[in-house]
Amino acid sequence: MKKLFLFLGIFLFLVSCKKNKVQSALSQDTVIHEKVNEFYTQYGKSNEAIYNQPIPDSLFSPGLKKVLDEAIHASKADIEKVKKSDHPDEKPLIFEGAIFSSLYEGFTGYKIKSVKIQDKTAEVLIAFEYNSSIPKETWMDTVHLINTEKGWRIDNVTFDKIGNSKDLKARLTEFVQSTK
C-alpha cells in the first residue's frame, strides 16, 4: 500500500511539473502576442508616433532602440538644417511610408500566424494585407524578439520580398547614412 501511495505521489508531482511548463510556454506566447500587438497598434499606421514621443525601452531592444534614436535624430537634424538653409522649401530627409512594414503604403490589417520561441529569442510571422488598392496586397513579415532581463523586446523586423529593404535595422541604418 505504501508503494502505491509513493508511486501515486511521484506521478502527481511529475504531472504537475509538466503542467507548469506548458502554462509557462503559454504565458510567454501570450506576452509575445501582446508585445507585437502593442507595436503595430502604436507604430503601425503612422510615422508620426516616431517623431512625437520617445522610443520606449519597454517595447524595443536596446540595439533597435539605439538605431531608431539615431535615425530620428538624423531626420530631425536634417529638418532643422533645411529650415535654416538658403532653400527652406526643399524637402528634408524624413521617414516616408510605413517604416515598420514591407509595403510603403502600410497595412489595413494583420494577423499573427505563428510564434516560434527558442531559448531567449522568438520569431513571429505576421500576415499583412492592404485592401485600399485593387488587387489587394498581401505579404508576410517576421518580427524578431529577444527576452531581456526586463522581458520580451522587439529586436528587428525581417521584411517580405516586396519590401525595398531586407530588414528594419538595415532600413534605418541606410536612412542614417543617407543624411551624412
Predicted regions and their residues:
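C-terminal motif of bacterial Sec signal peptides marking the signal peptidase cleavage site
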Residues: 13-16
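Short, aromatic-enriched amphipathic alpha-helices that serve as compact interaction elements
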Residues: 28-47
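Surface-exposed, charged secondary-structure patches
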Residues: 61, 67-134
